[in-house]
Amino acid sequence: MTTGSTDLIFLGTGTSSGVPSVPCLTDPNPTCKVCLSTLEPEGVKNIKRNTSAMVHFMHEDGRERNILIDCGKSFYESARQWYRLHNLRCIDALVITHAHADAYYGMDDLRSWCLIDKEKPYSIPVYLDQGTMDTLAQTFPYMVDSSKATGGGDIPSFTYHIIEHDKDFVVEGVTFTPLPVHHGKFMSTGEPFWSLGFRFRDLSWVSDCSSIPESTTAKITGSKVLVIDGLKEKTHPSHFSISEAIEYTNSLDPKPERAFIVGFCHTVDHYTEDAKVRALDSESHPKIRIAYDGQRISI
């Protein structure tokens, strides 16, 4: 059980490669205005690391809880920048959306959080589906079987919980409803690659999607807050475009009160796109915003 409000802190709002792109910065004749803008203070919201968020709330036992959604390649840098600013310290659980590098390749860096209390090492609960578990075990075998560790032997400790796509699960008193979505397809077979979003409290989180089945839309409908994928202006085989994200948000009945688009590549200027979506505000249109790293919202 929880008491008081729940906050969502965006630790990252970019795609897998992040923004800026280093080759854009080192180009002898640079032309990428978005990447170049990150070198100046006024372009700070164009710095976008792998999409990730922290669900922060006060438990009824009087201790704050932090549930991390995804832990990608840039998690360490996100934590270094945002943890102190938002008075975060521990990680009580990790929920993983899918088996791509930008969702779980930062897990090795969680060893430090397992050893915050050196007298009482902590095993972080991890919630993921079976396909993601299988891929993780191949990528990081020592995270699943500590006997496979090498070097000095300092490794993170995790306790794994397998999610079923059609069943709710509870993390630290918060009920999560899985939201299965298509995130591109397998190149070898053409079958859809599945990613999970999650509905909890009055928020639905869908960070990686190319299409959303009607059965999943039924679970999203009624959310007051929607976090939705939107890679760039043009269509893409594994992500919603910004226009598709807006269209999907407006297709919901009832519409969410607020929507935040995430997952941007380096062709998207935060300030330009945010001005565009703000211009859509009306009584019949949800407030859609371009999310940015470090942003904190109440849900």
Identify the meaning behind each predicted range:
Residues 1-206, 272-299:
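Binuclear metal-dependent hydrolase catalytic cores
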